[in-house]
């Protein structure tokens, strides 16, 4: 069980982090308790052996979700992962460096642009931009 915070019921801004969005005049004080699971447990319970494309948009909690897919990732059973990096990562205290280090051994990272994919070969502090952007992690093998 976890707390989920939002500005109103059904809001697309919901997050497990109580975000300070007062600079946007958004009050993030609504709270509800939700049930959560891991990708590994969900796949095991539902007999899912392989995931071709996994899209994550969990408002800053992406790295924690990925850690809950340890067995599937270690076994090479997830091929492509799309995730978002942006302002929510300020609240979760995660940096792009954390994602780069998580993926660098088995995945090639790309930033999704309007005209295609930009490969991310090496980490640089210039990647620490907290404006929402989507990334792909594509399994190397």
Question: What are the residue ranges of the model-derived segments?
Answer:
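Phosphate/nucleotide-binding beta-alpha loop and adjacent structural elements of enzyme active sites
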Residues: 1-141
């Amino acid at each position: 069980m976890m707390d989920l915070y939002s500005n109103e019921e059904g809001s697309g801004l919901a997050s497990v982090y109580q975000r300070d969005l007062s600079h946007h005049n958004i009050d993030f004080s609504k709270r509800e308790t939700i049930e959560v699971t891991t990708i590994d447990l969900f796949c095991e319970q539902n007999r899912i052996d392989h995931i071709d494309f996994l899209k994550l948009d969990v408002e800053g909690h992406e790295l924690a979700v990925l850690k809950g897919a340890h067995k599937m990732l270690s076994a090479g059973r997830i091929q492509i992962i799309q995730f978002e990096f942006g302002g929510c990562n300020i609240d979760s205290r995660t940096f792009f460096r954390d994602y780069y280090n998580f993926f660098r051994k088995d995945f090639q990272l790309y930033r999704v642009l309007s005209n295609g994919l930009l490969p991310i070969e090496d980490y640089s502090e210039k990647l620490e931009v907290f404006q929402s952007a989507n990334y792909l992690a594509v399994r190397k093998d």
